[in-house]
Amino acid sequence: MELNLKGKVAIVTGGGGVLGGSIARSLVENGVKVAIMDIRQDKLDARVNELKSFGEVIGIPCNVLDKASLEAARERLLAEWGSIDILVNTAGGNLPGATLREDQTVFDMKIEDFNRVTDLNMNGTVYPCLVFGKAMADQGSGSIVNISSMAALSAITRVPGYSVAKSGVSIFTQWLAMEMALKFNEKIRVNALAPGFFIGDQNRAVLINPDGTYTERSRK
């Protein structure tokens, strides 16, 4: 099946990261106007510079946990490009204090890091859905893609905070899909992807030894 996305407007939160950057590139290469959002200005600038030769792309500094920041981004995009057709929520991550080492139990987990991880991964998905989803509700069409995780489906890793947050993302996605279709328009779709492990900046040292071999954690 061939999809023609040329001229559509997409937002990719966390676009400075590995996953978000890959998705943003694919969209740009298919003729989509892409707004990359990230709280890290250096990562944002680097990604825009990487992709601008492939098509129309802009970078918008944005905090996915700050509603005012998200609303300002929405109004800018609507003023410049007229619509918001696609939202891909890839902003997220983990923290050492919310990850259990082999010699630790759940009682060693830092509750502060647990709270930060659940806030970023769950609310950092919910808030953009509410802000940019409003534009889709108003225009009667759009597609939201959230990033869940295989860790939300089974307790397969030592990442309790991340797993809890991604479980929340999964059920919120299902709920929002019904809400949008029943109360606004069936042309508004909300789905989630559940990737497995892949190497990124946040987990490279945990999964790969300095000599390039796999760590004990990555072999489990």
Where are these regions (language model features)?
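Amphipathic alpha-helical dimer-interface segment in Rossmann-like NAD(P)H-dependent oxidoreductases
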Residues: E75, R116-D138, A177-L182
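Active-site Tyr-X3-Lys motif and surrounding loop/helix of classical short-chain dehydrogenase/reductase
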Residues: A72-A79, A98-D108, E112-D119
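Canonical Rossmann dinucleotide-binding motif of NAD(H)/NADP(H)-dependent dehydrogenases/reductases
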Residues: L3-A35
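A glycine/serine/threonine-rich, flexible loop-to-helix segment
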Residues: E102, K183-F184, F197-K220
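Conserved glycine-rich Rossmann-like NAD(P)H-binding loop of the short-chain dehydrogenase/reductase
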Residues: V32-R47
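Catalytic Tyr-X3-Lys loop
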Residues: G93, F107-Y127, S141, V145, ...
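Active-site helix of classical SDR
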Residues: C129, A165, T173
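Residue(s) in the substrate-gating loop at a strand-loop-helix junction
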Residues: S149
